[in-house]
């Protein structure tokens, strides 16, 4: 049996038909579905390019193909290309056996309309919370208030009608978007943590020189609150704390965030690495840091934080989404509160005993998200969808 999986990620396609990404969704990510299915077809936005940029990784390959949707960004482009998008999604539903919708997202919503007409069972992978996505400060859009009302309502309906639901959180997203009666439900993060992702032991050394903070996240939106972090670092520097900050990530807000950093007038205190396209490069940056900070306004379960924990890195985060499932209350701050974050940074970076304790706890916690630990839960989820789809197809014959 084959499976089609929708995703809101963007991909690039070269004239030879190969599909590329700079993000997490390269070929190994999609092969996880082969634990229960014979092949995978990814339904996603695809842009045609002449050659792949340096560092991009291949997405399609043996048993993993693409059903491309015309690339669009934002509501205006979506409406302009709606006819082509509807045609592509309708074709995907007609030509497949099983369906997995990675939600929230417009493609998942579009597919759900087709599935409702046919009665075909489907599964959802809930990877984020649209209520937080459209919170004040997280996104700038004239229809933000409408989408903050409509999008959670739509996601609740999708989850209520599914035959199987997998959430990236243990309980945070489940409380707001519960599965329907009789649905199979589980939790499993998207993170990929092979043995090479883990260090062997917690950190015991104290920082030599400036305490080095690190942020890893997309700058396509301000969901991860890099602006709040820069303001907090500025507060710390003005109070005489000897720290620096490295930001890993890129996107449309990068220039704005860089300007905010320059406005601090502490030359060299904030450095930008851009997007790092290999896990090894990200791990190298994490290993040079003393404290990982992710003060997100919006979050499902942050893969970047789990990856930092696997390197035994002490972590601070906000109270949103699934972050409280990863780190204790004493390491959390309210979202959007730069003064509170500055106080927490000072509190932690000046306490080597606490940092050593955080390091050991985080490394142990990351072990719960290793590839070996998550594989069995994913397989049970896929197998349930396959069984339900096979039963539906049998009734249709």
Show which residues each predicted segment covers.
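Short alpha-helical donor nucleotide-sugar binding micro-motif in glycosyltransferases
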Residues: 93, 275, 284-289
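A conserved mid-protein helix/loop that constitutes part of the nucleotide-sugar donor-binding site
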Residues: 211, 215-235, 245, 252-258, ...
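Nucleotide-activated donor-binding/catalytic signature segment of Leloir-type glycosyltransferases, i.e.
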Residues: 258-276
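Conserved acidic donor-binding segment of nucleotide-sugar-dependent glycosyltransferases
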Residues: 330-338, 347-352
């Amino acid at each position: 049996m084959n499976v089609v999986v929708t995703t809101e990620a963007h991909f690039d396609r070269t004239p030879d038909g190969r599909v590329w990404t700079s993000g997490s969704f390269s070929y190994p990510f999609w092969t996880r579905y082969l634990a229960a299915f014979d092949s995978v077809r990814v339904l996603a936005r695809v842009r045609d390019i002449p050659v792949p940029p340096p560092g991009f990784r291949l997405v399609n390959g043996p048993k993993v193909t693409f059903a491309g949707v015309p690339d669009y960004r934002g509501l205006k482009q979506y409406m302009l290309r709606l006819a082509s998008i509807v045609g592509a999604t309708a074709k995907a539903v007609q030509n497949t056996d099983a369906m997995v919708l990675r939600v929230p997202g417009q493609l998942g919503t579009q597919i759900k309309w087709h599935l409702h007409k046919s009665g075909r069972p489907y599964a959802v992978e809930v990877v984020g919370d649209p209520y937080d996505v459209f919170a004040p400060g997280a996104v700038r859009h004239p229809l933000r208030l409408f989408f903050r009302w409509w999008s959670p309502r739509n996601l609740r309906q999708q989850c209520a009608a599914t035959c199987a639901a997998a959430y990236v959180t243990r309980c945070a997203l489940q409380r707001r978007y519960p599965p329907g009666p009789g649905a199979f439900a589980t939790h499993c993060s998207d993170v990929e943590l092979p043995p090479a992702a883990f260090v062997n032991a917690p950190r015991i050394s104290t920082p030599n020189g400036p305490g080095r903070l690190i942020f890893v996240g997309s700058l396509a939106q301000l969901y991860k609150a890099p602006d709040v972090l820069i303001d907090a670092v500025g507060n710390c520097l003005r109070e005489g704390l000897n720290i620096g900050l490295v930001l890993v990530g890129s996107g449309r807000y990068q220039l704005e965030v860089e300007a905010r950093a320059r406005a601090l007038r502490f030359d060299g205190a904030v450095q930008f690495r851009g997007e790092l396209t290999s896990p090894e490069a990200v791990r190298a940056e994490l290993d040079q840091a003393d404290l990982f900070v992710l003060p997100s306004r919006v979050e499902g379960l942050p893969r970047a934080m789990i990856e930092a924990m696997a390197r035994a890195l002490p972590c601070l985060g906000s109270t949103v989404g699934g972050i409280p499932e990863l780190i204790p209350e004493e390491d959390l701050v309210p979202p959007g509160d730069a003064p509170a974050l500055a106080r927490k940074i000072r509190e932690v970076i000046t306490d080597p005993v606490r940092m050593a304790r955080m390091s050991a706890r985080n490394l142990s916690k990351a072990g719960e998200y290793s590839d070996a630990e998550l594989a069995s839960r994913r397989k049970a989820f896929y197998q349930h969808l396959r069984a339900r789809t096979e039963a539906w197809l049998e009734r249709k014959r």
